Amino acid sequence: MFLEKLVEMARGKGKKLAVAAANDDHVIEAVYRAWRERVCEPVLFGPEEEITRIIEELVPEWKNPQIIDCPPEEAGRLAVEAVSKGECDFLMKGKIKTGDLMKIYLDERYGLRTGKTMAMVSVMEIPDFPRPLIISDPGMLISPTLEQKVDMIEHCVRVANVMGLETPKVAVVGAIEVVNPKMPITMEAAILSKMNQRGQIKGCIVDGPFALDNVVSEEAAKKKGIQSPVAGKADILILPDIEAANILYKALVFLAKAKSASTILGGKVPVVLTSRADSEETKFYSIALSAVFA
């Protein structure tokens, strides 16, 4: 339901998507669906013969897709170049290593840096849970610093605003809900909360530290006597590092059967940077989310 709203927001805007190394089955399926549902206009970079073969095998009804024929090793550079020149509006990773694509994206020659931290934001639609959860960062920053977490919160708030949340509630999550000097994450959480109170982080309500149960269950928060507007009502979860965030993301997807959409924000254009294990549906929703910000 929530993710379909993103699809509706992206539909019909004609945003051009540069797909770097599009010679991948799941990528082609997701991009075709995005084209069919008018979420974007794909431009496929990579070996034309292989891309055409995949299209003919999987989606033969897709006639005359725009393909820029090039060797796989050139696809990333040419796709980023197209985005840099304004020929395309946003970027998607295909059959290319994440590190290789982001190294090209961050090359100063292409002018796509903004000075902000680039981070992954994921929207999770969980069965029987009353609202979407926005989490960061399950796939980009290995061990984000305090300063980087400020930018992560800003990116998440932008996504929440697009989804209709005017003042989202942000929980900085760790293992416990009290400050413990032996656990630096809890001290960072308290600092972020105070920065929000002093107006250094705007447009949201930030509180922490919290354990996960305290921010998704009002009952759990009440049992522990936690009084906070965020307790049990969080819209955004800021996780301590990529390991915690990635484990939560995959637990929600594979165990709780959540649907998801992810995008990389912080550069001049968003990047669709999904995992090979992600489903065609996840890739499709990620294209839609990124198109909204393109």
From Swiss-Prot:
Where's it mainly located?
cytoplasm
What metabolic or biological pathway is this protein involved in?
Metabolic intermediate biosynthesis; acetyl-CoA biosynthesis; acetyl-CoA from acetate: step 2/2
A GO molecular function for this record? phosphate acetyltransferase activity
Q: Where in the cell is it found?
A: Cytoplasm
Q: Which UniProt keywords apply?
A: Acyltransferase, Cytoplasm, Transferase
Offer one example of a GO biological process linked to this entry: acetyl-CoA biosynthetic process
Key word Aminoacyl-tRNA synthetase present in the record? no
Its domain of life reads Bacteria
Q: Which Pfam families match?
A: PTA_PTB (PF01515)
> Enzyme group, top EC level?
transferase
Q: Which reaction does it catalyse?
A: acetyl-CoA + phosphate = acetyl phosphate + CoA
* EC number(s) per entry: 2.3.1.8
Describe the task this protein carries out.
In addition to acetyl-CoA (100%), the enzyme accepts propionyl-CoA (60%) and butyryl-CoA (30%).
The UniProt entry, under NCBIfam families, shows:
PRK08190.1
What interactions and quaternary structure are annotated? Homotetramer.
What is the protein name for this chain? Phosphate acetyltransferase
Instruction: Tell me the lineage of the source organism.
Output: Bacteria, Thermotogati, Thermotogota, Thermotogae, Thermotogales
Report which gene this protein is encoded by: pta
